[in-house]
């Protein structure tokens, strides 16, 4: 399967719209067992991925594709016969050929990525059953791969131009550039929040993060947050309320809370691709979160359509310090989540800053001590944590024994071959004079001999 979209008919029945090799399947998902309510045949010759993209406008579905053979162009489908009769293809708008992506603005214009002509093609949907040619972006927004519009602003992902373009489309006869955001990868897809002050972008390039931009001022755009899943390759993002919904290829679908956009937090995930979490263009292609019943549709290229239920979980953020023996900062040490095995670290003064799904969660510090941290929904709180048994002077490696291993460590400290942590310094300073030297070595050796 390729991309996925959704539609709700006049009776409230909801449908998933998904692409496959020979066309488009329209699936009634309101039943316990989803059933196909319509099948639209389309061009079927092309590459392995069967690129198809969908948007709806009222009771009409518009389909573009990158395939060959058959009637090439934008298919116009009347969905109003549902649920009693199958949808009907009215025509193919053939002012364009192959296309990877389209977007329909609420004002009634379709913006279509045009692979073989005018780049971004604009169609007028005043009569939605019979689109007419309106115009283009001209020489602007070249190499368009994806387009999204909101509030008379177009956000164009400009592919191998390595940039995301922002354009004023309030006058379609005089489209003007407002800003450019350069990127190092392939500018693949972009989406804004409802307020239009946050833009999230993907680059569909191995190792390139999903980026969160503050676009409150187009003259002063700033990168404020980043995220990337385990496979290091993301496909597309959509935003609904405070959540980013990511089709993340082999790791499936990811849901990220951006209530605090400077610290995005993964709050839910579902692995649609069962083979592995390695890189590569396999797995989850599309994610559609805009259903009325709260379900999420996910299309997986190998495993088909998933209908998922998200019991909304908000993120919380906790910062503080971890102390050993009540006063000594536990510096540069691991804090591993028992829930998902993710590892965080304290810095060199023992402080930590963790974002996590809300609730009480258990962590293991330094692979030794189990602690509990309480994350409150959409709140930033402070929690200092005190762990461990009392530190024993001379037990530098903290194995509860004072032996030759500790002598080796303190000798290396004195010779400046090893930089001790706060804990190690405290237990090495045997005479508590604030200096580690030969006197401390002698005192540790004396302890060993006495024992």
How should each PLM-predicted stretch be described?
Residues 1-326, 344:
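Feature marking well-ordered beta-strand scaffolds used for ligand recognition
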Residues 124, 168, 257, 391-401, ...:
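Acidic, divalent-cation-chelating loop motifs in proteins
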Residues 318-334, 397-401:
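Structural motif
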Residues 332-333, 398-422, 432-451:
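Alpha-helical segments with a strong preference for the paired helices of cellulosomal dockerin domains
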Residues 358-369:
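A short, solvent-exposed beta-strand micro-motif common in secreted/extracellular proteins
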Residues 367-390:
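Structured interaction patches on ligand/partner-binding surfaces of diverse proteins
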């Amino acid at each position: 399967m390729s991309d996925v979209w959704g539609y709700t008919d006049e009776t409230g029945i909801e449908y998933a719209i998904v692409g496959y090799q020979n066309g488009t399947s329209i699936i009634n998902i309101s039943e316990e067992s989803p059933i196909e309510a319509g099948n639209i045949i389309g061009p079927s010759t092309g590459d392995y991925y069967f690129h198809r993209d969908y948007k709806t406008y009222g009771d009409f579905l518009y389909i573009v594709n990158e395939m060959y053979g058959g009637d090439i162009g934008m298919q116009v489908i009347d969905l109003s016969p549902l649920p009693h009769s199958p949808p009907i293809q009215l025509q193919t708008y053939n002012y364009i050929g192959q296309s990877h992506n389209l977007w329909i603005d609420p004002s009634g214009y379709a913006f279509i990525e045009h692979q073989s002509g005018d780049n971004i093609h604009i169609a007028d949907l005043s009569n939605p059953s019979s689109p007419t040619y309106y115009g283009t972006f001209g020489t602007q927004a070249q190499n368009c791969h994806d387009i999204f519009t909101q509030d008379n602003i177009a956000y164009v992902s400009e592919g191998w131009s390595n940039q995301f373009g922002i354009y004023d489309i309030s006058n379609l006869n005089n489209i003007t550039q407002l800003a450019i955001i350069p990127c190092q990868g392939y500018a693949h897809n972009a989406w804004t929040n409802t307020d239009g002050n946050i833009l999230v972008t993907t680059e569909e390039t191995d190792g390139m993060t999903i980026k969160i931009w503050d676009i409150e001022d187009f003259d002063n755009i700033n990168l404020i947050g980043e995220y990337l899943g385990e496979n290091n390759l993301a496909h597309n993002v959509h935003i609904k309320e405070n959540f980013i919904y990511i089709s993340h290829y082999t790791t499936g679908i990811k849901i990220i809370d951006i209530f605090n956009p400077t610290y995005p937090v993964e709050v839910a995930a579902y692995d649609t691709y069962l083979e592995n979490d390695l890189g590569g263009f396999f797995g989850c292609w599309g994610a559609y979160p805009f259903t009325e019943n709260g379900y999420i549709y996910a299309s997986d290229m190998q495993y088909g359509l998933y209908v998922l239920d998200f019991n909304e979980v908000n993120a919380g953020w906790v910062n503080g310090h971890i102390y050993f023996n009540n006063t000594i900062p536990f510096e540069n040490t691991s804090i591993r989540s028992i829930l998902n095995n993710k590892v965080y670290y304290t810095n060199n003064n023992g402080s930590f800053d963790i974002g996590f799904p809300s609730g009480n969660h258990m962590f293991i510090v330094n692979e030794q001590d189990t602690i509990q941290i309480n994350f409150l929904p959409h709140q930033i709180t402070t929690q200092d944590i005190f762990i461990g048994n009392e530190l024993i002077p001379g037990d530098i490696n903290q194995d509860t024994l004072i032996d030759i291993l500790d002598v080796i460590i303190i000798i290396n400290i004195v010779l400046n071959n090893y930089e001790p942590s706060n804990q190690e310094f405290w237990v090495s300073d045997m005479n508590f004079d604030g200096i580690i030297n030969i006197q401390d070595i002698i005192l540790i050796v004396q302890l060993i001999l006495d024992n």
